[in-house]
Amino acid sequence: MIMKKILFITTILWLAVKMPAQDALPVLVSDTIASDTIAPRLQWPENVTVRLDSLMNEPLLKKTQLGLLIYDLTADSAIYKQGERQTLRPASTMKLVTAITAIDKLGGGYQFRTSLYYSGLIERNILRGNLYCVGGMDPRFNNDDMRAFAESVLKMGIDTICGRLIADTSMKDDTRLGEGWCWDDDNPSLTPLLIGKKDMFMERFRQELNDLGIVVMDNEEAIAGNKTKNRPLIHLCSRFHSLDQVLMRMLKESDNLYAESVLYQIAASGGVKNASATHARQWINKLVTRIGLNPGDYKFADGSGLSLYNYVSAELLVSLLRFAYHNQNVYGQLYPALPVAGVDGTLEKRMKGAFTNGNVRAKTGTLTGISSLAGYCTAANGHQLAFAIINQGVLRNASGRTFQDKVCTALCEP
């Protein structure tokens, strides 16, 4: 009996030695954007790496700074990087920071609100009191909205106002320009009461009332900054526009006023009055911390990227794009709002090649000396990629755009 057991064990050991060993399955090493090395086991088409290596020898890069990171979202691993941690000015790719923070903080269903109230009494078609326009910094407030305001007064039977038209701009602080904006730029006015993107809300409201035959007896200029809090006011009308509507123009057309309006929605969230850019930065910093980076390594000055005080890195932009990709609530709002190469927005005339056209979705950025691009694309192997490219110190922005287009082509071509 003992001999049989010995013979059985010997046979098993002999078979184990003689049988060919199976190839070991690759071990997937968890790779994060913040890691110092690209995952060595990631299988990626060699020709793509060769193309990118070749682009690193472009004459443009000999005299300028580059921040570049390409990340495979499908494999969750970085595949190429160059100066990805350098802090550079993002230009309008700063709008990605603003947009992703806003969607995460406010939710895609968030709505911008502008409201009309009155005080006093209505006697025989005469309002003995004031009308209060309460601003919510809605950049989409338009002529139809203004007409609705005036018609709501008419529907109350009012044809005469023995009082004032008062602008309540207490939603935000009284700054009208962003930190670090150049005085000679065509800068938007940061007022909570907007009409057609212009700071002439109260004049237009008075004219709209007049067109409907409603007389305002007090011809003094509206008093800006009055707060309606603790006043016995009666609601007349509110007009709304959704965050996704605002994001669509903000990102596709790179609208600076829309971006600043979104920044102040973040700042005012939670009922903060006299909201400032500082309030918004607190929420941006919290998100940066959540994605595993140190907010102290960056500078966030405004929401649009107009400021010369903004400093981010390609790593930060890609980290936020990765966060959005893995958060369907954020990605579902962000992705459709990005410009599409060869199709619309600021990418309409770029990357019309067979493999990039309709494939690359990314935010562009342009300031004097700065050209940037950050977003998503699908590689020839079917993998979803996130990328960020910041060219700083370029004398001609067209050269930066050409370089970025070449990078995207290298990623998308077979």
Pin down the residues of each PLM region.
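Beta-lactamase-like hydrolase cores
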Residues: Q22-T74, Y80-T87, E151-G157, E413
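A conserved catalytic-loop motif detector
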Residues: Y132, A148, M171-I214, S238, ...
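Active-site-adjacent, His/Asp/Glu-enriched structural segments that form or flank metal-binding
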Residues: Q111-K172, W181-P188, I195
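Bacterial Sec-dependent N-terminal signal peptides
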Residues: M1-T32, T37
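Active-site SXXK
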Residues: D76, P90-G108, L165, R204-F205, ...
